[in-house]
Design a protein with these regions (language model features):
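Soluble catalytic regions of large protease machineries
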Residues: 2-190
Length: 190
C-alpha cells in the first residue's frame, strides 16, 4: 500500500535519510537546510568527512550511499519507488552519479544496488527510529506559523545545534540528540 504523506513529512524524511546515513558512515553533519517557497522546495545536508586514510573506493561508495539515502527513506515512508532514471529528485541522482565513472548500464545497476543497500541500512529498527526522530524535528520546524505562506523560508540546522527559521531561532540539539539516541539504544542492547 502506498502512503501519501504531506510535503513537510516527505521533506523531513528525505533529509533525515541523508543525515542518518552520513552519521552511520561517520561523516560529521555540519548543517541540514530545507528551503521552501510557494512553488518549490529543496533541502540539503553538508557533511565534513574525515577521509584521511580511507581507501578511495570506500569514499566513493559512501558518497554515493549518502546520495541514495534520501530517496530510500521516502520509499520506506511511502512505499513508492522513485526510479533513478525518471526521478524528480534530480540533484540526488546527479550527486550519486558524480561519485561514479563507467558505462551507463554498469553505473545504473550499481546505483540501484546502492539504493537497495541504503534502504536496507535505514530500515534496521534502530536506524529507522533515528530517521523518524530527526524527520519529526525537521517536519515540526516546518509547522511554524507562516512557514508555508508565500515567500521564502528555510529550516537550518547548523553545527552549533541551532535551528533558524525566517529570523527566529529555536534551540535544537540535533547531532547530540542523534548520538544520544544511538547511545541509549546501545545501552539497552547491552
Amino acid at each position: 500500500m502506498v502512503n501519501k504523506p504531506s510535503l513537510a513529512k516527505r521533506i523531513g524524511y528525505h533529509e533525515s535519510g541523508h543525515a542518518i546515513m552520513a552519521y552511520l558512515l561517520h561523516h560529521p553533519i555540519e548543517e541540514i537546510k530545507v528551503f521552501v517557497n510557494k512553488y518549490s522546495h529543496y533541502g540539503y545536508i553538508i557533511t565534513d568527512p574525515n577521509l584521511d586514510g580511507r581507501p578511495v573506493s570506500r569514499c566513493i561508495k559512501e558518497g554515493a550511499l549518502i546520495s541514495c539515502a534520501g530517496n530510500a527513506a521516502v520509499y520506506l515512508l511511502t512505499g513508492r519507488k522513485y526510479w533513478w532514471r525518471s526521478s524528480g529528485d534530480y540533484v540526488d541522482v546527479v550527486g550519486a552519479l558524480s561519485w561514479l565513472y563507467g558505462c551507463k548500464d554498469e553505473i545504473t545497476a550499481y546505483i540501484e544496488f546502492l539504493w537497495i543497500q541504503a534502504k536496507n541500512l535505514l530500515s534496521e529498527p534502530e536506524n529507522w527510529c533515528a530517521v523518524e526522530y530527526l524527520a519529526g524535528c525537521i517536519e515540526g520546524a516546518q509547522q511554524e506559523p507562516g512557514y508555508w505562506d508565500e515567500g521564502e523560508y528555510y529550516v537550518h540546522y547548523d553545527y552549533e545545534d541551532t535551528l533558524q527559521m525566517d529570523g527566529f531561532e529555536v534551540e535544537r540539539i540535533i547531532s547530540r540528540e542523534i548520538e544520544k539516541y544511538f547511545s541509549h539504544e546501545e545501552g539497552l542492547s547491552n
